[in-house]
Curated annotation (Swiss-Prot):
Similarity section: Belongs to the MnmA/TRMU family.
Protein name from the UniProt record: tRNA-specific 2-thiouridylase MnmA
Location of this chain's protein in the cell: Cytoplasm
Organism, scientific name: Pediococcus pentosaceus (strain ATCC 25745 / CCUG 21536 / LMG 10740 / 183-1w)
EC number(s) stated in the UniProt entry for this protein: 2.8.1.13
Keyword annotations of the record: ATP-binding, Cytoplasm, Disulfide bond, Nucleotide-binding, RNA-binding, Transferase, tRNA processing, tRNA-binding
UniProt-annotated stretches for the region Interaction with target base in tRNA: 98-100
Chain residue ranges for the region called Interaction with tRNA: 150-152, 313-314
Protein's job: Catalyzes the 2-thiolation of uridine at the wobble position (U34) of tRNA, leading to the formation of s(2)U34.
Length: 377
């Protein structure tokens, strides 16, 4: 039996059930486990209530129960500088960013990893649902989790082989009900705590209200691509491609079909809308993405043109595509086998080869079958 007692694993503990079970399992396996609570955002509300304080209390309870030391580290400045300013800049450009992808790369597996190493860590572990495998040549591979409903490789697609070398994802081979069962049987007080959802720094707050605190909103015309004014928008940053809710337009022509956001014109401050879920302006034949990154060195060995599958939003199913990389592999054009709906600039494009996540980048633009740019951003 392997003696793990000399291997120190620092666990990123959020106070939730997933990371608590990670700490418990590693402790059971004999590792030298240390818990660390990351405070990335000051979420104190107008009544002085801070959810982070409650979460930290849960970390303390779990750590005491399983018998491990725990610390708290403040990454608010790093988060503001590396994640939140990016988030705001993208919204200023009329795009819809995914801060979780940046947070994982810059905070959880960079700032936190560096901090863990300063505590003598051999590895860090988190409650992410993903798997890491090393092949016979020493290359790290990022694989989907067993629980396809919880798989988080989409958010981990910007990690490097060097980062994965130091990472453990103990929940990768488990399904969520099993995780809760382990927590309950181990007597962990968080076994029935509800999962956190949405962007961490917004939490339960109203998104429109939150964004309005940081960026000035400028109302403007809401119109069809034929130039018919349908109403007024509250500010382009509040809308995303394919959005239906919150437009304030009834049916009308086309058998009372619902209206959707089909584009934005930043220079004229116009929000374009169209009727029908199947509206042709929502469907792309291809997209361009930049800031492309491969998880390991094997990515570039595939050549600049190859077949794979791609995912362009977290909850979407990945679809078959052909990719065409630029000479330095930093940009890519992706051709879809079948038209893809509501491709959104600013979101992450993530590439897969079967169960393996091979890398990803950020979507810049989408095009129809005639190579005309959609969304008019």
């Amino acid at each position: 039996m392997t003696d793990n007692s000399k291997t120190r694993v620092v666990v990123g503990m959020s106070g939730g059930v997933d990371s608590s079970v990670v700490a418990y399992l590693l402790k059971q396996q004999g590792y030298d486990v240390v818990g660390v609570f990351m405070k990335n955002w000051d979420d104190t509300d107008e009544n002085g209530y801070c959810t982070a304080t409650e979460d930290y209390k849960d970390v303390a309870k779990v750590a005491a129960k399983i018998g491990i030391p725990y610390y708290s580290v403040n990454f608010e400045k790093e988060y503001w500088d590396r994640v939140f300013t990016y988030f705001l800049d993208e919204y200023k450009k009329g795009r819809t960013p995914n801060p979780d992808v940046i947070c994982n790369n810059e905070i959880k597996f960079k700032a936190f990893l560096d901090y863990a190493i300063s505590l003598g860590a051999d590895y860090v572990a988190t409650g992410h649902y993903a798997q890491v495998e090393r092949d016979e040549n020493g290359h790290q591979h990022l694989l989907r989790a067993t629980d396809s409903n919880k798989d988080q490789t989409y958010f981990l697609s910007q990690l490097s082989a060097e980062q994965l070398d130091r990472v453990m994802f103990p929940l990768g081979g488990m399904i969520k009900p099993e995780v809760r069962k382990v927590a309950e049987e181990a007597g962990l007080s968080v076994y029935d705590k509800k999962d956190s959802v949405g962007i961490c720094f917004i939490g339960e707050k109203n998104f429109r209200e939150f964004l309005g605190n940081y960026l000035p909103a400028k109302a403007g015309k809401m119109m069809t691509l034929d130039g018919e004014v349908k109403g007024e928008h509250a500010g382009l940053m509040y809308y995303t491609i394919g959005q239906r809710r919150g437009l304030g337009i009834g049916g009308g022509s086309k058998n009372n079909e619902p209206w959707f956001v089909v584009g934005k014109d930043l220079s004229k401050n116009i929000l374009y809308v169209g009727q029908g879920f199947e509206n042709s302006h929502l469907y792309a034949a291809s997209l361009d993405a930049s800031d492309m990154h491969f998880v390991n060195k094997l990515g570039e060995e595939r050549g600049r043109d190859f077949r794979c599958t791609a995912k362009f939003r977290y909850r979407a199913q990945d679809v078959p595509v052909t990719v065409h990389f630029s000479e330095d592999f930093s940009k890519v054009t992706v051709d879809f086998d079948d038209p893809a709906r509501a491709i959104t600039p600013g979101q992450a494009l993530v590439l897969y080869d079967g169960e393996e996540c091979i890398g990803g980048g950020i979507i810049d633009a989408a095009y129809n079958s005639e190579k005309k740019m959609l969304q008019y951003i």
